[in-house]
Curated annotation (Swiss-Prot):
Keywords: RNA-binding, Transcription, Transcription antitermination, Transcription regulation. NCBIfam families: nusB. It comes from the Bacteria. The gene is nusB. This is Transcription antitermination protein NusB. One of its GO terms (molecular function) is RNA binding. It comes from Aliivibrio salmonicida (strain LFI1238) (Vibrio salmonicida (strain LFI1238)).
Amino acid sequence: MGVSVKPAARRNARQFALQAIYSWQISKENVAAIEEQFLTADKYDEEEHHAKEPKLQAPETDVAYFRDLFSGVALNHIKLDGKMRPYLSRPLQDLDQMELALLRMSIYEMMNRDDVPYKVVINEAIELAKVFAAEDSHKFVNGVLDKAAPTLRKK
């Protein structure tokens, strides 16, 4: 790969992936259609209030990472749910959809992205929960991921 990816580009990729996963969970729409909506949205949406928001394009966002997280979660959500279930304090169906999307994405990342330290995955999940999820969701997400990490990573 040669070129190192900036942490901000990965952070933006996670943010877009989380939103895409959430959209997929709610709409049950085709994964490719949702991905296409996200990848083409900025080309048509150049309003002033969007000027400060990150764009889903390189180099600002790691587009390949976005695609990996989104498609990885969509293709493996049943397996991911099974991996998180032992660490949940309530039934899976009682989780907020944003919490579920965030936990699925983070568990996928821990299991499949050895290039990212698990503490980075947890920290990024906490920060995303603070922005996108309910008020105390970041504490719940942190607790689940902290308990799950040792079994998902052998490091």
